Swiss-Prot record:
<dbReference type="InterPro" id="IPR012623">
    <property type="entry name" value="Toxin_18"/>
</dbReference>
<feature type="signal peptide">
    <location>
        <begin position="1"/>
        <end position="18"/>
    </location>
</feature>
<dbReference type="Pfam" id="PF08087">
    <property type="entry name" value="Toxin_18"/>
</dbReference>
<keyword id="KW-0960">Knottin</keyword>
<feature type="disulfide bond">
    <location>
        <begin position="24"/>
        <end position="38"/>
    </location>
</feature>
<keyword id="KW-0964">Secreted</keyword>
<dbReference type="GO" id="GO:0005576">
    <property type="term" value="C:extracellular region"/>
</dbReference>
<protein>
    <recommendedName>
        <fullName>Conotoxin-like peptide 2</fullName>
    </recommendedName>
</protein>
<keyword id="KW-1015">Disulfide bond</keyword>
<feature type="disulfide bond">
    <location>
        <begin position="37"/>
        <end position="49"/>
    </location>
</feature>
<feature type="disulfide bond">
    <location>
        <begin position="31"/>
        <end position="42"/>
    </location>
</feature>
<keyword id="KW-0732">Signal</keyword>
Length: 52
């Protein structure tokens, strides 16, 4: 592959990863799933993001 093709594939991947990291839910906020929380831990019993 050419360098420009590799660059074209890598740039959107990096941009989407950064957007996902900024879109996470803060500790103490409501959540349903662990992947929604910045810490990666959602309380099943109470439904809020836990700290790690």
């Amino acid at each position: 592959m050419k360098f420009s093709t590799i660059l074209l594939l890598v740039c959107p991947t990096v941009a989407l990863s950064a957007q996902y990291a900024l879109a996470c839910t803060e500790t103490g906020r409501n959540c349903q799933y662990s992947y929604e929380c910045c810490s990666g831990a959602c309380s099943a019993a109470f439904g809020f993001c836990l700290h790690r």
